Curated annotation (Swiss-Prot):
Keyword Translocase listed: no
Assigned GO CC terms: cytosol
Binding positions for Mg(2+) 2 per the UniProt entry: E406
Regions annotated as coiled coil: none
EC number per UniProt: 6.1.1.6
Name of encoding gene: lysS
Reactions listed under catalytic activity: tRNA(Lys) + L-lysine + ATP = L-lysyl-tRNA(Lys) + AMP + diphosphate
Name recorded for this polypeptide: Lysine--tRNA ligase
Family the entry assigns: Belongs to the class-II aminoacyl-tRNA synthetase family.
Length: 489
């Protein structure tokens, strides 16, 4: 505790010291066997007569959220309960209440149920004990924690005084359970792959780096688990998925957290079209589980019941900007178009394929409100995807956008080890030109491919973003228990 306590905190601390001196140390209590939760208390006794209620002995536990005269309101995970202390029939109990109890204290109370004159089911307390003293003043009852950063920084208070936030996390758990149920029923095997990786790969992103003392080498926290999962397909597993944490050493904003939850799945003898159907069916299964198909986001109504739209990237660019990249035959023409449309390019982006991707990011992403599969990404930005047999500049790849945000990324997996090596070498060239998100050459993965990866479809879904959408939350902080925050100084 700080030496500079305010008056209220000092008073609370003194009450704790007094409790200990009188032999009532709350921290010596190791176990509580309550008979009811708030919800089960209401369900069990709300419709019984006074005579019937007096027959029961009930033990309740919870945190005090309101005090008024001889009434206490406590809260547990299931709801709220009212307690009553009769100062005439239980003077010693009232003295304990008066001398030691504060808002925020965790207590255990024993007594019998009763109905007040106003018809409120209440516990008539016969024994009362603090089990954890609240030594700081809790948030004000009606306004609580309102600052979003303070809520995320002190999630333990946010969950106590903001029931709506609790409901978000309950829904998050329901969504994750539904995803697993869908995949398990579809015959996918849940697996675990390494978080520490010697070679960077599986996505284009900046990594976190650490040093592995025992192996005397630098390792990365994984930016994706794609490579390891595809090795399992080479090993003969037909359908695999993994849900877990990924780490990307990049910016923090309302839709990005450096540590995030993602799910990736791979299916042998499938392509990107199969994964497209899988994506839509999975999301609709989750909506069915939630019994909700329409979602509101910044004034937009998103309808997930209708079939998801499909559009090629170059067609969408043409619709939005009027530029038809199918007619562009060389890099110089593409560079001129980028300059004309004020599209800034990095050194490694001075070519048609990267410019197509930059046009899409700058002009098209923000137009994608209803669920839309954007297909056929340029090969230069898809180093692990199989090229389109009808147009080798592009790949059999899609990303799903809903309300301008990317939720899923999938493709027909490149399974030609010679072509994959050439793609990796192209990525190394881009890295030398300043692309710090480029993949590294992964000899272990190339070795696995050389033993034969069957045609495979792969899919990754950002779980946090999906939860944001389905919980109608505007910030990723609201759907992550403990988001990364800048250190207070």
């Amino acid at each position: 505790m700080s030496d500079r306590l305010n008056d209220q905190a000092q008073n609370r601390l003194q009450k704790l010291l007094n409790l200990k001196q009188t032999g009532n140390d709350p921290y010596l209590i190791t176990k509580i066997e309550n008979t009811h939760s708030a919800a089960s208390f209401q369900k069990a006794f709300a419709n019984q007569s006074d005579a019937e209620l007096k027959q029961y002995q009930v033990i309740l536990t919870g945190r005090i959220i309101a005090l008024r005269q001889t009434f206490i309101i406590i809260q547990d995970f299931s709801g709220k309960m009212q307690l009553y202390i009769n100062k005439k029939t239980a003077p010693e109990l009232f003295e304990y209440f008066n001398n030691y109890i504060d808002l925020g204290d965790q207590i255990v109370a024993t007594g019998h149920p009763m109905m007040t004159k106003t018809g409120v089911l209440t516990l008539n307390v016969e024994r009362l004990q603090i089990v954890a003293k609240c030594l700081q003043t809790p948030p004000e009852k009606w306004h609580g924690l309102t600052d979003p950063e303070a809520r995320a920084r002190k999630r333990y208070l946010d969950l106590t005084y903001n029931r709506a936030q609790v409901e978000v996390f309950l829904k998050r758990t329901q969504i994750i359970t539904a995803i697993r149920t869908f995949l398990n029923e579809a015959g996918f095997l849940e697996v675990e792959t390494p978080i520490l990786q010697a070679v960077l790969g599986g996505a284009n992103a900046k990594p976190f780096k650490t040093h592995y003392n025992a192996l005397k080498g630098d390792f990365y926290l994984r930016i994706a688990n794609e490579i390891a999962l595809k090795k399992l397909i080479v090993g003969g597993l037909p359908k695999v998925y993994e849900m877990g944490r990924m780490f990307r050493n990049e910016g923090v904003d309302t839709t990005h957290n450096p540590e995030f939850t993602s799910i990736e799945m791979y299916q042998a003898n499938a392509d990107y079209a199969v994964m497209m159907d899988l994506t839509e069916n999975l999301i609709k299964f989750v909506c069915k589980t939630l019994n909700q198909w329409s979602f509101n986001w910044n004034g937009q109504t998103l309808d997930l019941a209708k079939p998801f739209k499909k559009v090629k990237m170059v067609d969408l660019i043409c619709q939005v900007t009027g530029v038809n990249f199918d007619d562009v035959k060389d890099d110089q023409t593409a560079i001129a178009l980028a300059k004309q449309h004020k599209v800034e390019l990095k050194k490694h982006e001075q070519n048609k394929q990267h410019i197509i991707n930059r046009f899409f990011e700058q002009f098209c992403e923000h137009t994608l409100i209803q669920p839309t599969f954007v297909t056929h990404y340029p090969k230069a930005v898809s180093p692990l995807a199989k090229q389109d047999p009808h147009n080798p500049e592009f790949t059999e790849r899609f990303e799903l956008f809903i309300n301008t945000k990317e939720l899923a990324n999938a493709y027909s997996e490149l399974n030609d080890p010679l072509e994959q090596r050439a793609r990796f070498e192209q990525q190394l060239q881009e890295k030398r030109m300043g692309n710090d998100e480029a993949s590294e050459l992964d000899e272990s993965f190339l070795d696995a491919l050389s033993f034969g990866l069957p045609p495979t479809g792969g899919l990754g879904i950002g779980v946090d973003r999906l939860v944001m959408l389905l919980c109608e939350c505007s910030s990723i902080r609201d759907v992550v228990f403990f988001p990364q925050l800048r250190e207070l100084k």
